[in-house]
C-alpha cells in the first residue's frame, strides 16, 4: 500500500459525547461490518465498557474507503480511552496518528477531559479537526458550540461537519474530511525498523498481542525483533490488522498500523509506549515519550471468605496480564485476614478492576479505604514510601511526611462556581487561576492534595455542580504536610483495617464522623461497647454502643428488695466479666461506612 493513501486518525471525545457510536457508523459505512454484526459500540469489547459507556483499552481498526476523487484509501481508526486515569494510554495512541477528529456533543459543548486530550494531540503535532455530534437532539446549538470550540481551543470550526452518529447524518462528510485534512504518514521503509506499541493485551492462545504503528522500516513475518525498553527479543509469528476482524499480512511498512504476535508470554515485556526494532539491525534511539506507569491510588482487597484467597490471586494475575498498570502484593490484617494491597492509576481504574473481579471471576470482596503514596522522612534521616496507614511509623520517629499534590482543572457553568470553589477550599486546595472561557463557562485551576481527591471528591464535585462540572488532573509534586494516623478502637482494641492517614486540622472532625458512623453499624452486645478515634494515645472522639439488658427481676413478685438487688448485682458481675473476654464482630457494613463517611 503506498503511503500517500494511508490516513491514521483517532477520535477525541469526552465520555458520552458519542465517540463509540460514531466509530460504529464509520465501520458500517465503509462496509467493515456485516449487517448481523451491528452491535452498538462494536469496538468496546469488555462488557463493562459497553455498560458504563466508556472505552478502557485502545483498539485499532483498518477501514477501506473509496473517496470522491475515485482513489482507494486506507483509514486506520485508533480508538482511545477518554478518561483521565488512562491519559498515558491516550497519549501513546495519539502518538500513533497524524490526525485527530475532535467530537463535541452539540448540546453539551467542550468538557475538561476533551480539552486535556486535545492539548495532548496538539503537543504531538496532530492535525485536529472538529465534528459536532448529536445535532438531531432538540437541545443542540451547533452555532454556539462552534463559537465555543473557536474561543476555548482555538480551532477553526467554521466548516466543522454537523453529524448525528445515531441517525447516520453526516457520516460521508466525515470520511471525506478525514481523507482531506489528515496528512499522510511520513517515514522511510528502508531505514532500521522503529514501531511504537500503543496497546497490548493477552490472548490465552497466542500470547501477547501488540498493536503497533510502524514509523520507519519494514516488518515481515519471521523477523527477529527486540523490544527496546525491556531488552527482550522474539520472533514474529503473525502480523496483520483488524478490519475489524483479524486479517493477516506477510509484511507491514512505514506508516501502517496493525497487530504483531510474537509468542510473548508476559505483558510486562511488551509495555505500552515501547519501541519495537530488529534484533540484528536495531534503530539507534527508541521513539520518545516512553514512561513507566506508576500507580497513584492504593487500596486493600480482601476476599470475604478467606478460602478464596488463592482464587483471588489467580484472578488478579489474569487481570494483570491485560493491564500492566495494575500492581498488587500480599498483605494481611488482623481484622480482615489475608488479602492484597493493590495499586491503581486512579479511582475509575480501581472501580473497574473491582467490578471485573466481581463479575468475571465471581469474587466477593471487601475493599479498604483508598490511600495514596506518602514519603516519610524519619528522625534518622531515612526516607520511606508508605502506601497504607498501618505502615506509618510511630509519631515520635517521624521528622516529616510529604504527600503528593496534583493540579486539577475543573470546567463548570457560571452558576455553580461558588460551590466548586468552596469544595476545593474545604479539600485544602490552593487556587491557581479562574478563567472565563465563554460567557457561561469557567475553568477553575487548583492545586490539591491527592489524598483529598481519592475519597469522595469526584462525587461531591458532581453534586455541587448538578453533574455539569468536569474534572481533569495531573500529578504535580510532593509537599510536606502535617499528617497523622487516625486509629479506630473498638472495645479498646485497634482495628487495623480502619486506620486512616488524615491532616491534623481535620483529624477531630473526621474522627467524630467515623465514630458516629461506626456506632450505627456495630450490633448491640450484652455489655456496653466503646468506639473511639485516637491519634497516638490521645482519644479525639468517642461514642458508646448501649448494652442490651435482660430483665432478670421479672420472676420476682413483690417480696423483699434485697432479692432483686442480688439478681441485679449478679447480672452486673457477669457483664463485667463478659466485657473483659468479649469480642465484637464487625459487620461488612462497618468497613463500607468508612469509605462513604460523607454521605
Swiss-Prot record:
Record membrane topology: Peripheral membrane protein
SUPFAM superfamilies, alphabetized: EF-G C-terminal domain-like, P-loop containing nucleoside triphosphate hydrolases, Translation proteins
One GO term of the biological process aspect: positive regulation of translation
PROSITE patterns (alphabetical): G_TR_1, G_TR_2
Location of the tr-type G domain: 4-186
A Gene Ontology cellular-component term: plasma membrane
UniProt: GTP binding residues: 16-21, 133-136
UniProt catalytic activity: GTP + H2O = GDP + phosphate + H(+)
Keywords: Cell inner membrane, Cell membrane, GTP-binding, Hydrolase, Membrane, Nucleotide-binding, Protein biosynthesis
One annotated GO molecular function: ribosome binding
EC numbers for this chain: 3.6.5.n1
Localization per Swiss-Prot or TrEMBL: Cell inner membrane
Function: Required for accurate and efficient protein synthesis under certain stress conditions. May act as a fidelity factor of the translation reaction, by catalyzing a one-codon backward translocation of tRNAs on improperly translocated ribosomes. Back-translocation proceeds from a post-translocation (POST) complex to a pre-translocation (PRE) complex, thus giving elongation factor G a second chance to translocate the tRNAs correctly. Binds to ribosomes in a GTP-dependent manner.
HAMAP family for the chain: LepA
Family: Belongs to the TRAFAC class translation factor GTPase superfamily. Classic translation factor GTPase family. LepA subfamily.
UniProt protein name: Elongation factor 4
Amino acid at each position: 500500500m503506498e503511503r500517500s493513501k494511508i490516513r491514521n486518525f483517532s477520535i477525541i471525545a469526552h465520555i458520552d459525547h458519542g465517540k463509540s457510536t460514531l466509530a460504529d457508523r464509520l465501520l458500517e459505512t465503509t462496509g467493515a461490518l456485516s449487517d448481523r454484526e451491528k452491535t452498538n459500540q462494536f469496538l468496546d469489547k469488555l462488557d463493562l465498557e459497553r455498560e458504563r459507556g466508556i472505552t478502557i483499552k485502545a483498539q485499532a481498526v483498518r477501514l477501506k474507503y473509496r473517496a470522491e476523487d475515485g482513489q482507494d484509501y486506507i483509514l486506520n481508526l485508533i480508538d482511545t480511552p477518554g478518561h483521565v486515569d488512562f491519559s498515558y494510554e491516550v497519549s501513546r495512541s495519539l502518538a500513533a496518528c497524524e490526525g485527530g477528529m475532535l467530537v463535541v456533543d452539540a448540546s453539551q459543548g467542550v468538557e475538561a477531559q476533551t480539552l486535556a486530550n486535545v492539548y495532548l494531540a496538539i503537543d504531538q503535532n496532530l492535525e485536529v479537526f472538529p465534528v459536532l455530534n448529536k445535532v438531531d437532539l432538540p437541545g443542540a446549538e451547533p452555532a454556539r458550540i462552534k463559537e465555543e470550540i473557536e474561543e476555548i481551543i482555538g480551532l477553526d470550526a467554521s466548516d466543522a461537519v454537523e453529524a448525528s452518529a445515531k441517525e447516520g447524518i453526516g457520516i460521508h462528510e466525515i470520511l471525506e474530511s478525514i481523507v482531506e485534512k489528515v496528512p499522510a504518514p511520513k517515514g522511510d521503509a528502508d531505514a532500521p525498523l522503529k514501531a511504537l506499541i500503543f496497546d497490548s493485551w493477552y490472548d490465552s492462545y497466542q500470547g501477547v498481542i501488540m498493536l503497533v504503528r510502524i514509523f520507519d522500516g519494514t516488518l515481515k513475518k519471521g523477523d527477529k525483533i527486540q523490544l527496546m525498553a525491556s531488552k527482550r527479543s522474539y520472533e514474529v509469528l503473525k502480523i496483520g490488522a483488524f478490519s475489524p476482524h483479524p486479517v493477516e499480512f506477510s509484511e507491514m511498512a512505514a506508516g501502517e498500523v496493525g497487530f504483531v504476535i510474537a509468542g510473548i508470554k508476559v505483558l510486562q515485556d511488551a509495555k505500552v509506549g515501547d519501541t519495537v526494532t530488529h534484533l540484528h539491525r536495531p534503530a539507534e534511539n527508541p521513539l520518545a515519550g516512553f514512561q513507566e506507569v506508576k500507580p497513584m491510588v492504593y487500596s486493600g482487597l480482601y476476599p470475604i471468605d478467606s478460602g478464596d484467597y488463592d482464587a483471588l490471586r489467580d484472578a488478579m494475575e489474569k487481570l494483570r496480564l491485560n493491564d500492566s498498570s495494575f500492581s498488587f502484593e500480599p498483605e494481611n490484617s488482623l481484622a480482615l485476614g489475608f488479602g492484597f494491597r493493590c495499586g491503581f492509576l486512579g479511582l475509575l481504574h480501581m472501580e473497574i478492576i473491582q467490578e471485573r473481579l466481581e463479575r468475571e471471576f465471581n469474587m466477593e470482596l471487601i475493599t479498604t479505604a483508598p490511600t495514596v503514596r506518602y514519603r516519610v522522612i524519619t528522625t534518622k534521616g531515612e526516607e520511606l514510601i508508605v502506601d497504607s496507614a498501618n505502615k506509618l511509623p510511630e509519631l515520635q520517629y517521624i521528622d516529616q511526611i510529604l504527600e503528593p499534590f496534583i493540579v486539577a482543572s475543573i470546567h463548570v457553568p457560571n452558576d455553580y462556581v461558588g460551590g466548586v470553589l468552596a469544595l476545593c477550599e474545604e479539600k485544602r486546595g490552593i487556587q491557581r487561576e479562574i478563567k472565563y472561557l465563554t460567557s457561561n463557562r469557567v475553568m477553575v485551576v487548583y492545586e490539591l492534595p491527592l489524598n483529598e481527591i481519592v475519597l469522595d471528591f469526584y462525587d461531591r464535585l458532581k453534586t455541587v455542580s448538578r453533574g455539569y462540572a468536569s474534572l481533569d488532573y495531573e500529578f504535580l509534586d510532593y509537599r510536606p504536610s502535617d499528617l497523622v494516623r487516625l486509629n479506630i478502637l473498638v472495645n479498646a482494641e485497634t482495628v487495623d483495617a480502619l486506620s486512616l492517614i488524615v491532616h491534623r486540622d481535620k483529624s477531630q472532625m473526621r474522627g467524630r464522623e467515623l465514630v458516629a458512623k461506626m456506632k450505627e453499624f456495630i450490633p448491640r452486645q450484652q455489655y456496653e461497647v466503646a468506639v473511639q478515634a485516637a491519634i497516638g494515645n490521645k482519644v479525639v472522639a468517642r461514642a458508646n454502643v448501649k448494652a442490651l439488658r435482660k430483665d432478670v427481676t421479672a420472676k420476682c413478685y413483690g417480696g423483699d428488695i434485697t432479692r432483686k438487688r442480688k439478681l441485679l448485682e449478679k447480672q452486673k458481675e457477669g457483664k463485667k466479666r463478659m466485657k473483659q473476654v468479649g469480642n465484637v464482630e464487625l459487620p461488612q457494613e462497618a468497613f463500607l461506612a468508612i469509605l462513604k463517611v460523607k454521605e
